[in-house]
C-alpha cells in the first residue's frame, strides 16, 4: 500500500501532504489488509496488480476480469488528471510543441494503464514471406475474451444504454460494469474539427504503435462522404506524425462469436 501511494505521488499532482488521504482512499477500495502486505513490486502497474490480489483475497471483488478491471481503473484514476486539467495542459504544451503534447498524452495513457502495455506485450508478431512481399502476422493475446461466467452474468444484468457505445464521450470516467468496460482512468482530448467538437483518445488494446481514435462528440452513425476525407486531412494537420483512416460505414464492424 505504501509503495503504491509513493508511486501515485511521484506520478501525479498529489504531494506528500496527501499521503494519509491517499492511503485511506486506496484502503476503502481494496481493504485495510493491504497496509500489512509486503511486495517486491516497484512499478505502478505491478503494485496495482498486487492490490487487486489483496482485494480479491478479502472479498472486495470477485474473480471476473470485469470486476478486476473496474477496480484497477479506479486505482489508476488516482494518477490521472481530471479532463479539464488534462486538456488545459495538452493545449498549453501544443502551442509550443505539438509533438511534445501528443507524446505526453501517450505516456500518460501508458502510465495510468489505460493502454494495456503489460497485456499487449503478450501478443505474438512475426514476418512471413509471400509472393507480394513480407507479410506481418499478429496473434492478439492481449484483449481477453469474456469467460462463460461473465457472459452468463451479463445476460442477467439489467440492460443499460449508457454509454451509447464503447467509444463515445460518455465513457470518460465511467465506472464500468460486467457488460461494459471500465473507463475511470480514460481521458479524451477535445479539439475543433470543421466547426464541431471532436475527441482524440488512445486505444487500450493497440493493434499497432500509438493506435489512437478520433471521434465525434455526438454519437452518430458512421458514414463515408466527402466530409470524411476533409476531416482526415484536417486531423493529420492537427496531429503531426500520425496518419488517419476511417472505419467502413457498415452496421456492424467486428465483434465476438462468444456473444
Where in the sequence are the language-model features?
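Active-site microenvironments that recognize anionic phosphate/pyrophosphate groups
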Residues: 1-224
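Short Pro/Gly-enriched beta-strand edge/turn motifs at strand-loop
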Residues: 171-172, 243-245
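Helical scaffold of the NTase/Pol beta-like nucleotidyltransferase catalytic core
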Residues: 185-189, 220-244
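A short acidic-Thr-Gly-centered motif at the start of a beta-strand
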Residues: 192, 235-236, 249-250
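Histidine-centered divalent-metal-coordination microenvironment in nucleic-acid enzymes
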Residues: 210-216, 249-259
Amino acid at each position: 500500500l505504501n509503495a503504491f501511494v509513493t508511486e501515485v505521488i511521484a506520478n501525479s499532482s498529489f504531494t506528500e501532504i496527501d499521503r494519509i488521504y491517499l492511503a485511506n482512499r486506496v484502503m476503502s477500495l481494496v481493504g485495510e489488509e493491504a497496509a500489512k502486505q509486503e511486495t517486491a513490486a516497484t512499478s505502478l502497474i505491478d503494485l496495482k496488480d498486487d492490490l487487486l490480489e489483496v482485494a480479491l483475497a478479502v472479498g472486495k471483488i470477485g474473480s471476473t476480469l470485469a470486476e478486476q478491471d473496474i477496480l484497477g481503473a479506479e486505482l489508476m484514476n488516482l494518477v490521472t488528471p481530471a479532463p479539464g486539467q488534462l486538456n488545459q495542459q495538452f493545449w498549453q504544451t501544443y502551442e509550443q510543441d505539438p509533438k511534445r503534447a501528443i507524446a505526453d498524452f501517450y505516456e500518460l495513457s501508458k502510465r495510468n494503464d489505460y493502454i494495456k502495455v503489460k497485456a499487449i506485450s503478450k501478443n505474438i508478431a512475426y514476418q512471413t514471406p509471400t509472393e507480394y512481399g513480407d507479410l506481418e502476422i499478429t496473434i492478439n493475446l492481449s484483449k481477453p475474451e469474456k469467460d462463460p461466467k461473465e457472459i452468463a452474468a451479463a445476460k442477467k444484468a439489467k440492460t443499460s444504454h449508457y454509454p451509447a457505445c464503447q467509444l463515445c464521450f460518455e465513457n470518460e470516467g465511467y465506472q464500468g460494469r460486467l457488460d461494459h468496460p471500465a473507463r475511470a482512468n480514460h481521458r479524451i482530448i477535445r479539439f475543433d474539427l470543421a466547426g464541431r467538437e471532436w475527441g482524440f483518445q488512445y486505444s487500450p488494446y493497440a493493434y499497432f504503435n500509438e493506435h489512437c481514435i478520433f471521434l465525434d462528440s455526438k454519437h452518430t452513425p458512421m458514414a463515408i462522404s466527402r466530409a470524411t476525407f476533409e476531416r482526415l486531412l484536417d486531423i493529420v494537420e492537427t496531429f503531426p506524425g500520425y496518419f488517419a483512416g476511417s472505419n467502413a460505414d457498415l452496421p456492424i464492424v467486428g465483434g465476438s462469436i462468444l456473444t
